[in-house]
Protein backbone atom coordinates (compact mmCIF):
# COMPACT_ATOMS: atom_id res chain seq x y z
CA UNK A 1 0.00 0.00 0.00
CA UNK A 2 1.50 3.28 -1.05
CA UNK A 3 1.56 6.36 1.12
CA UNK A 4 -0.54 9.32 0.02
CA UNK A 5 1.03 12.68 -0.71
CA UNK A 6 -2.23 14.44 0.21
CA UNK A 7 -2.37 13.29 3.84
CA UNK A 8 -1.75 16.02 6.39
CA UNK A 9 -2.73 16.67 9.99
CA UNK A 10 -4.76 13.47 10.30
CA UNK A 11 -3.87 11.45 13.37
CA UNK A 12 -3.92 7.67 13.21
CA UNK A 13 -6.08 7.69 16.35
CA UNK A 14 -8.71 9.70 14.43
CA UNK A 15 -8.50 7.34 11.49
CA UNK A 16 -9.01 4.34 13.80
CA UNK A 17 -11.92 6.02 15.58
CA UNK A 18 -13.65 6.73 12.26
CA UNK A 19 -13.22 3.07 11.29
CA UNK A 20 -14.77 2.05 14.60
CA UNK A 21 -17.74 4.36 13.97
CA UNK A 22 -18.20 3.04 10.43
CA UNK A 23 -18.59 -0.42 11.88
CA UNK A 24 -20.94 0.81 14.64
CA UNK A 25 -23.17 2.31 11.94
CA UNK A 26 -23.06 -0.86 9.84
CA UNK A 27 -23.98 -2.96 12.89
CA UNK A 28 -26.95 -0.66 13.54
CA UNK A 29 -28.01 -0.98 9.89
CA UNK A 30 -27.83 -4.77 10.18
CA UNK A 31 -29.83 -4.73 13.43
CA UNK A 32 -32.52 -2.49 11.93
CA UNK A 33 -32.75 -4.86 8.96
CA UNK A 34 -33.70 -7.57 11.47
CA UNK A 35 -36.42 -5.28 12.87
CA UNK A 36 -37.69 -4.72 9.32
CA UNK A 37 -37.85 -8.41 8.45
CA UNK A 38 -39.58 -9.24 11.74
CA UNK A 39 -42.37 -6.69 11.31
CA UNK A 40 -42.72 -7.61 7.62
CA UNK A 41 -43.48 -11.26 8.45
CA UNK A 42 -46.98 -12.50 7.65
CA UNK A 43 -47.55 -13.63 11.25
CA UNK A 44 -46.60 -10.18 12.64
CA UNK A 45 -47.74 -7.85 9.84
CA UNK A 46 -47.06 -4.30 10.92
CA UNK A 47 -46.29 -2.89 7.46
CA UNK A 48 -45.66 0.71 8.53
CA UNK A 49 -43.32 -0.44 11.31
CA UNK A 50 -41.52 -2.66 8.79
CA UNK A 51 -41.06 0.29 6.43
CA UNK A 52 -40.01 2.58 9.29
CA UNK A 53 -37.25 0.15 10.32
CA UNK A 54 -36.22 -0.50 6.70
CA UNK A 55 -35.64 3.25 6.34
CA UNK A 56 -33.75 3.31 9.65
CA UNK A 57 -31.47 0.55 8.33
CA UNK A 58 -30.88 2.47 5.12
CA UNK A 59 -30.09 5.65 7.06
CA UNK A 60 -27.49 3.88 9.22
CA UNK A 61 -25.84 2.43 6.12
CA UNK A 62 -25.76 5.92 4.60
CA UNK A 63 -24.02 7.15 7.76
CA UNK A 64 -21.36 4.46 7.32
CA UNK A 65 -20.91 5.50 3.69
CA UNK A 66 -20.62 9.18 4.66
CA UNK A 67 -17.94 8.32 7.22
CA UNK A 68 -16.07 6.15 4.70
CA UNK A 69 -16.17 8.96 2.15
CA UNK A 70 -14.83 11.38 4.78
CA UNK A 71 -12.09 8.89 5.69
CA UNK A 72 -11.04 8.77 2.03
CA UNK A 73 -11.18 12.56 1.77
CA UNK A 74 -8.76 12.81 4.68
CA UNK A 75 -6.62 10.15 2.99
CA UNK A 76 -7.22 7.62 5.72
CA UNK A 77 -7.82 3.96 5.01
CA UNK A 78 -11.18 2.37 5.71
CA UNK A 79 -10.84 -0.86 7.68
CA UNK A 80 -13.97 -2.97 8.03
CA UNK A 81 -14.54 -5.29 10.96
CA UNK A 82 -16.79 -8.31 11.19
CA UNK A 83 -20.41 -7.49 11.86
CA UNK A 84 -22.12 -9.60 14.49
CA UNK A 85 -25.51 -11.14 13.98
CA UNK A 86 -28.45 -8.93 14.95
CA UNK A 87 -28.71 -8.37 18.68
CA UNK A 88 -32.41 -9.20 18.56
CA UNK A 89 -34.59 -10.81 15.89
CA UNK A 90 -37.89 -11.32 17.76
CA UNK A 91 -39.97 -8.75 19.61
CA UNK A 92 -42.82 -9.20 22.06
CA UNK A 93 -44.45 -5.96 20.90
CA UNK A 94 -43.89 -2.66 19.13
CA UNK A 95 -43.04 -1.27 22.56
CA UNK A 96 -40.27 -3.86 22.90
CA UNK A 97 -38.91 -2.89 19.47
CA UNK A 98 -39.00 0.85 20.24
CA UNK A 99 -37.26 0.26 23.56
CA UNK A 100 -34.55 -1.80 21.83
CA UNK A 101 -34.16 0.82 19.09
CA UNK A 102 -33.88 3.62 21.66
CA UNK A 103 -31.06 1.72 23.36
CA UNK A 104 -29.32 1.26 20.00
CA UNK A 105 -29.59 4.95 19.15
CA UNK A 106 -28.15 5.90 22.53
CA UNK A 107 -25.23 3.51 21.95
CA UNK A 108 -24.58 4.99 18.49
CA UNK A 109 -24.73 8.48 20.01
CA UNK A 110 -22.25 7.52 22.74
CA UNK A 111 -19.87 6.18 20.10
CA UNK A 112 -20.18 9.40 18.07
CA UNK A 113 -19.40 11.45 21.17
CA UNK A 114 -16.31 9.30 21.75
CA UNK A 115 -15.23 9.95 18.15
CA UNK A 116 -15.77 13.68 18.69
CA UNK A 117 -13.63 13.47 21.84
CA UNK A 118 -10.82 11.77 19.90
CA UNK A 119 -11.00 14.53 17.28
CA UNK A 120 -10.80 17.22 19.96
CA UNK A 121 -7.95 15.47 21.79
CA UNK A 122 -5.99 15.26 18.54
CA UNK A 123 -6.69 18.91 17.69
CA UNK A 124 -8.69 18.03 14.58
CA UNK A 125 -11.36 20.74 14.29
CA UNK A 126 -12.37 19.58 10.81
CA UNK A 127 -13.30 16.11 12.07
CA UNK A 128 -15.01 17.52 15.18
CA UNK A 129 -17.08 19.88 13.01
CA UNK A 130 -17.95 17.06 10.59
CA UNK A 131 -19.24 14.88 13.43
CA UNK A 132 -21.21 17.75 14.97
CA UNK A 133 -22.78 18.99 11.75
CA UNK A 134 -23.45 15.65 10.06
CA UNK A 135 -24.30 13.32 12.95
CA UNK A 136 -24.76 14.65 16.48
CA UNK A 137 -27.79 16.87 15.87
CA UNK A 138 -29.49 14.18 13.80
CA UNK A 139 -28.72 11.66 16.54
CA UNK A 140 -30.45 13.85 19.13
CA UNK A 141 -33.53 13.97 16.89
CA UNK A 142 -33.52 10.17 16.48
CA UNK A 143 -33.27 9.60 20.23
CA UNK A 144 -36.17 11.99 20.83
CA UNK A 145 -38.27 10.28 18.15
CA UNK A 146 -37.67 6.79 19.56
CA UNK A 147 -38.32 8.02 23.12
CA UNK A 148 -41.62 9.54 21.95
CA UNK A 149 -42.57 6.35 20.10
CA UNK A 150 -41.71 4.27 23.16
CA UNK A 151 -43.97 6.46 25.30
CA UNK A 152 -46.76 6.24 22.73
CA UNK A 153 -46.51 2.44 22.40
CA UNK A 154 -46.59 2.13 26.20
CA UNK A 155 -49.68 4.33 26.26
CA UNK A 156 -51.64 2.44 23.59
CA UNK A 157 -50.69 -1.08 24.67
CA UNK A 158 -50.78 -4.27 22.64
CA UNK A 159 -53.44 -5.42 20.23
CA UNK A 160 -55.66 -2.72 18.77
CA UNK A 161 -53.42 0.01 20.19
CA UNK A 162 -50.40 -1.33 18.30
CA UNK A 163 -52.47 -1.70 15.15
CA UNK A 164 -53.57 1.94 15.36
CA UNK A 165 -50.03 3.10 16.19
CA UNK A 166 -48.76 1.27 13.09
CA UNK A 167 -51.50 2.67 10.86
CA UNK A 168 -51.66 6.23 12.16
CA UNK A 169 -48.37 7.23 13.78
CA UNK A 170 -45.88 5.39 11.59
CA UNK A 171 -47.75 6.49 8.47
CA UNK A 172 -46.43 10.06 8.91
UniProtKB/Swiss-Prot annotation:
GO MF annotation, one: ferroxidase activity
Disulfide bond entries: none
Alphabetized UniProt keyword annotations: Iron, Iron storage, Metal-binding, Oxidoreductase
Binding site for Fe cation 2: 60, 105, 139
Metal-binding among keywords: yes
Complexes and interactors: Oligomer of 24 subunits. The functional molecule forms a roughly spherical shell with a diameter of 12 nm and contains a central cavity into which the insoluble mineral iron core is deposited.
Name of protein: Ferritin-2 heavy chain
